[in-house]
Structures are given as C-alpha cells and as structure tokens.
C-alpha cells in the first residue's frame, strides 16, 4: 500500500532542512518585505497542500522546484522566482454564476449577460439532474437536445409548480394585514405587515427608524454599563474617605441604590439618597446620570406604545393596508379565472408565446 512521503523520516528531514534554509535565505537575499511575505505564504500553502501526497513524480517535481527556488535566492534572480511562483499560486474559485455563463456560451448564440437566460439555465440544470437521478435521462445529452427539447419541458414543469402555488394561495382566501414589531432594547417598534408592503415595498423611513433606534438603544446600554463601573469606583472612594474621617467602614447595597423603577409616581421612582455625605458626593452624580438614561429609555417605550395605539389601530395604516390587500386579492382572483378560462386550455409547450411561462407572465403571475 502506498505511504505518505511525510511519514518517511529521511524525506521529512530533507524537506524541513531545505525549508529552514530557504526561510533563512529569504530576508538575506530579498530586500522587499512584500515579496518576502509573498514567498513565505506561497511556500506555506504548498507544503500544507502536498503534505499527504503519495505520487512520487509529484513530490520529485516539487522538491526540484523548491531547490531551484533556493538557488535563485542565493543568486539574486528575483524575476525567475516570480515566474516560478506563478503556477503555484492558488487559483480563485469560480463563482456559480460564472460557471453558468460559461455553460451558456457553449449552448449557442445566446445573450450571456441576460439574467433571464441565466435563470432559464438554472431551471434546465436542476431538471436534468433530477431526471438523471431518477434514471429517466442518460448521463450524456447533446447541447442541441438540451436547448431545443429539454428546456421547454423544464420551464413548463417549473411553471406548473408555480401555477399550483398561486392556486393554493388564492384558495386560502384574501390575505389580511397585521401588526408586527421588532424589539430594539426596551422598545417594541410596531409596523404593518401585509402582502402590499413586504420586501422591497416596505417603507424606507421604517428601516431608517429601526436602524436609528437600534443604534440609540445600544448606545444607551453602553452608557449605563459605563456608569455602573464608575459608580462602583465612586463607592470605593466614598468608603475610603468616610473611613479616613470617622474610622468606620460604611456598607451600601450599590445595585439597590442604583435601582430605577418605572410606572410609579415620579417622586418615588428611585430610592432615597444615602444618609452618608461621602456617598452623596461621590455616587449621586453618577446615579443622577443613570436615572436620566433610564427615564429617556422609558419615554421611548411610551412613545412607541402610543404610536401603536393611535396611528396603526384606529383606522390608520392597518385598515388602509388591509383594504389594499383585499383589493389586490380580488384583482388576482379575477385575472386567474380569466386566464384559466381563456388561455390555459390552449397552452402549447414548444410554441414560444403560447407556453405556460409566457401565459403566466402575460397575466402578471
């Protein structure tokens, strides 16, 4: 059984010795830090990549190139090193879209930059793979047959599935608008969610508001955390100064002292001030700032609760979008019935303009 060269002691010793020699020679013979980094990075990648090579010829070739690299370094032939490294550099992985475009070029005279053609090829590729997995199509299919015979069948199957989903949605009845919210800190930002304003149709102002509230809430939390840290240090200073004056160590429950209560009368929102003068001098300024931050946070909560009640529910946006959603459903239902009666019975797969995808596009589906 073939064995990895990395497990042969003599080979391992030779490679490590050569690698150390090259690493020592790189800064001596090359004065460009960028080029030094490039050489080291390429060597590291190649050593890791071929660590488990079992091909003797591959290992022999790479060791020769490794030795040649060391000789070029000693002789100062930097251009030859660049030429030697070019084929060793890792190629960038092709994007899936690029592969599709390359495949489209081989299909014939098509507009490879057209997104619609790319989408059609996606559908065709998925159709062929699915049928081949089921044993209904051979492994090799000529490009002409793919383009002229299988593409209409694939598009028709895809359109049939789309038609089924449209029918099911219409069968479920008119969609209704509803209230939804996103939580940012203590705030619940309410907005209307409906088929009319989903995705890109959603209000840009709403997105700006949510991002602003997220930023402000996080800033408020960070400020409170910073104040808590400062309050702890301030309490230590107060305890120390009190001890210097009265030789007594005071005890204060700091979390309770900094506690802020909402939804109660303003005069009792916070605990009374400490009886110790030093605590008042050191901790109370930080405490006041924390109470202001808490107060600001609860004010925003009240604002969004009122916004939900006044602007959304009582004949506002919710009623408007609910009405528009029902109008859209009625229009789509009328178009679907018209399409089912006038056009669907006469669909023909292989005639452009009368195939199912064209019919759905014509009626806005």
UniProtKB/Swiss-Prot annotation:
Q: Which top-rank group of organisms is this from?
A: Eukaryota
Which species is this UniProt entry from? Saccharomyces cerevisiae (strain ATCC 204508 / S288c)
Going by the UniProt record, its keywords in alphabetical order are:
Glycoprotein, Mitochondrion
Name the UniProt record assigns to this protein:
Required for respiratory growth protein 1, mitochondrial
Q: Which family does it belong to?
A: Belongs to the RRG1 family.
- PTM details? N-glycosylated. Glycosylation is important for correct localization of the protein.
| Other known facts | Present with 1670 molecules/cell in log phase SD medium.
User: Which BP terms does GO give this entry?
Assistant: mitochondrial genome maintenance; mitochondrial tRNA 5'-end processing; vacuolar acidification
Q: What GO CC terms are in its UniProt record?
A: matrix side of mitochondrial inner membrane; mitochondrion
Q: Where in the cell is it found?
A: Mitochondrion
What role does it play?
Essential for respiratory growth and required for mitochondrial protein synthesis. Required for vacuolar acidification.
Q: What is its main location?
A: mitochondrion
**Gene name for this UniProt entry:** RRG1
- Asked if the record carries the keyword Mitochondrion, the reply is yes
């Amino acid at each position: 059984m073939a064995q990895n060269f990395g497990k042969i002691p003599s080979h391992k010793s030779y490679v490590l010795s050569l690698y150390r020699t090259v690493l020592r020679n790189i800064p001596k013979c090359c004065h460009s830090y960028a080029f030094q980094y490039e050489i080291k990075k390429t060597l590291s990648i190649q050593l890791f990549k071929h660590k488990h090579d079992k091909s003797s010829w591959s290992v022999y070739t790479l060791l020769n190139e490794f030795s040649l690299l060391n000789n070029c370094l000693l002789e100062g032939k930097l251009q030859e090193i660049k030429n030697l490294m070019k084929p060793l550099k890792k190629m960038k992985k092709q994007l899936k879209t690029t592969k599709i475009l390359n495949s489209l070029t081989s299909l014939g005279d098509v507009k490879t930059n057209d997104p619609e053609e790319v989408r059609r090829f996606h559908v065709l590729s998925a159709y062929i793979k699915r049928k081949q997995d089921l044993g209904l199509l051979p492994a090799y299919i000529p490009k002409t047959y793919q383009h002229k015979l299988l593409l209409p069948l694939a598009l028709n199957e895809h359109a049939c599935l789309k038609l089924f989903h449209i029918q099911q949605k219409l069968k479920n009845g008119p969609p209704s608008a509803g209230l939804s919210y996103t939580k940012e800190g203590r705030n619940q930002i309410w907005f209307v969610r409906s088929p009319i304003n989903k995705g890109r149709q959603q209000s840009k102002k709403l997105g700006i508001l949510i991002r602003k509230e997220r930023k402000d809430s996080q800033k408020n939390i960070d400020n409170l955390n910073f104040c808590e840290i400062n309050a702890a240090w301030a309490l230590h200073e107060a305890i120390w100064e009190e001890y210097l004056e009265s030789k007594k160590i005071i005890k204060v429950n700091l979390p309770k002292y900094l506690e802020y209560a909402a939804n109660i009368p303003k005069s009792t929102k916070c605990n009374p001030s400490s009886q110790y003068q030093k605590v008042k001098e050191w901790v109370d300024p930080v405490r006041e700032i924390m109470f202001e931050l808490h107060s600001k946070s609860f004010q925003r909560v009240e604002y969004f609760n009122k916004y939900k009640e006044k602007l959304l529910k009582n004949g506002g946006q919710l009623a408007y979008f609910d009405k528009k959603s029902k109008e859209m459903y009625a229009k789509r239902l009328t178009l679907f019935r018209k399409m089912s009666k006038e056009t669907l019975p006469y669909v023909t797969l292989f005639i452009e303009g009368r195939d199912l995808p064209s019919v759905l596009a014509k009626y806005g589906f």
